[in-house]
Regions:
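Hydrophobic core of transmembrane alpha-helices in multi-pass small-molecule transporters
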Residues: 102-118, 230, 310-324
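Helix-to-loop junctions at the C-terminal end of transmembrane segments
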Residues: 64-76, 272-283, 368-369
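Intracellular juxtamembrane helix-capping segments at the cytosolic ends
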Residues: 118-131, 324-337
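Helix-loop-helix hairpin linking two adjacent transmembrane segments in secondary transporters
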Residues: 142, 146-193
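Structural signature of the two symmetry-related core transmembrane helices
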Residues: 79-93, 286-300
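Extracytoplasmic
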Residues: 12-47, 68, 239-244
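Extracytoplasmic gate region of multi-pass secondary transporters
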Residues: 28, 32-36, 220-272
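Symmetry-related core transmembrane helices of the 12-TM Major Facilitator Superfamily/SLC fold
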Residues: 170-186, 377-395
Length: 415
């Protein structure tokens, strides 16, 4: 089934996943970081101070995600999605109205937990559970919401900040989230597989069984995959978090940097869709071990380049891996460990990802304050992804897909 026919047949569910992923933008680093300079100036914070606040809020988010993510195994996407959207709307409004520095860690926690954590988690778990044979396409399509937000929201809000006060723009974000609530409610009036009331569709994973989260943590493949799971979140988050400072040391304006983000997003969307197609066509094991190699080139280029053309090339390499990263890790949890406890297992993966996004900004901020430049840090990031690629390759070779037996307890359509 091609993409267009697939979308036409499943438009309501795919659009709901797209909207949830798009609204997650307001809790993502690429959005919050465009206000970094304003927030640091308003509250008189150094790079290390701001990085520490961001790290504290994000670490708290990662801790809560381990348990909160399991709610997607219990409640309808319609109910939990609406609840999280309302919470994110209130959190962005709180950022606009906040007068005190001590409130920042709490606000960052809410933005990161609801935006970065829960919304993409709900979207990806729903796509993985609702679709079986076309899981790759479903994940790729829903994840374009995140990619479009990453491309256009930083540019739009950076331009608006030239005219409007930064706090007023958080009110705009709040209104946008709130307006999506009735749309999600209508789109998911009839869910594809309402988890709490319908007969389940269960796809078993490695060794033909459903894995619990405890079993996953005890499995060696999990530990071989761990650097690859945490790495993109830590390193890519750091890149976007330090974008204002990075532009400054390269001699560019902030607007010149964010103007290149649409290029990044176009490439990310293309490779998001390609990875979804390749996942369904060739299987996860053939593409998973190699998808982080472009990140090696990206971060090494960020170390060397001094022109915007060079930066654009680096962003393209980064986008190739980022696009695939939107689809492949979620498919990994579903295919290797099954879908019966996918919400609980994926919550662990999301918590690890959120943990990485906490460590990255905090670490880079401290190192900058201590005189270790961001460009040198990016070179080390490139070497890190060589290491994670090697471990993925070893893990997939040892735990090969011929040990995976997919069984479907109650099949729906082939889609």
């Amino acid at each position: 089934m091609g993409y267009f026919e697939f979308i036409r047949s499943n438009i309501a569910w795919l659009l709901a996943g797209f909207i949830l992923a798009l609204n997650s933008s307001f809790g993502q680093t690429f959005f919050i970081s465009i206000f970094a300079g304003k927030i640091q100036s308003y509250f008189s914070l150094s790079h290390g101070d701001w990085g520490s606040i961001y790290m504290i809020g994000t670490l708290a988010s990662a801790t809560v995600m381990v348990w909160a993510g399991a709610t997607s195994d219990i409640f309808r996407t319609r109910s939990i999605g609406v609840l999280v959207l309302v919470g994110l709307s209130l959190s962005t409004l709180l950022m606009a109205l906040n007068p005190a520095v001590w409130m920042l860690p709490i606000i960052i926690f809410l933005l990161r937990f609801l935006g970065q954590g829960m919304l993409p988690h709900i979207s990806s778990v729903s796509m993985s559970r609702w679709f079986i044979a076309q899981r790759g396409k479903a994940l790729a399509i829903s994840n374009t919401g995140y990619a479009l937000g990453e491309a256009f929201l930083p540019v739009v809000f950076t331009i608006l900040m030239l005219t409007y006060h930064w706090q007023h723009l958080w009110v705009v974000a709040s209104l946008f989230c709130f307006l999506m609530v009735p749309l999600i409610w209508v789109l998911l009036q009839n869910e594809r597989t309402p988890q709490s009331i319908a007969e389940e569709v269960i796809v078993f994973g490695l060794l033909g069984k459903s894995w619990s989260r405890k079993e996953v943590i005890a499995h060696p493949l999990f530990w071989l995959m761990l650097p690859a799971i945490i790495g993109p979140s830590a390193c890519v988050t750091s890149f976007f978090f330090q974008q204002v400072y990075f532009a400054e040391i390269k001699g560019w304006t902030h607007l010149q940097l964010v103007a290149l983000f649409p290029i990044y997003t176009i490439v990310a969307i293309v490779f998001n869709l390609i990875s979804g197609w390749a996942l369904d066509k060739f299987g996860l094991d053939r593409i998973l071990p190699f998808y982080q190699i472009p990140m090696v080139f990206a971060f090494i280029l960020f170390y060397f380049v001094s022109t915007q053309i060079g930066l654009a090339v680096g962003l393209c390499f980064l986008a190739i891996s980022a696009g695939a990263n939107s689809t492949l890790p979620t498919a990994f949890w579903a295919e290797y460990y099954g879908t019966q406890f996918l919400g609980t297992i994926k919550a662990l993966g999301t918590a690890i990802m959120v943990l990485g996004s906490a460590i990255g900004p905090g670490m880079t901020g401290f190192l900058i304050d201590w005189g270790f430049g961001i460009e040198k840090q990016y070179f080390i990031f490139g070497l890190y992804f060589l290491f994670s690629t090697l471990l993925m390759y070893v893990g997939v070779k040892i735990y090969s897909p011929d040990k995976i037996v997919e069984k479907i307890a109650h099949p729906l359509s082939a889609a």
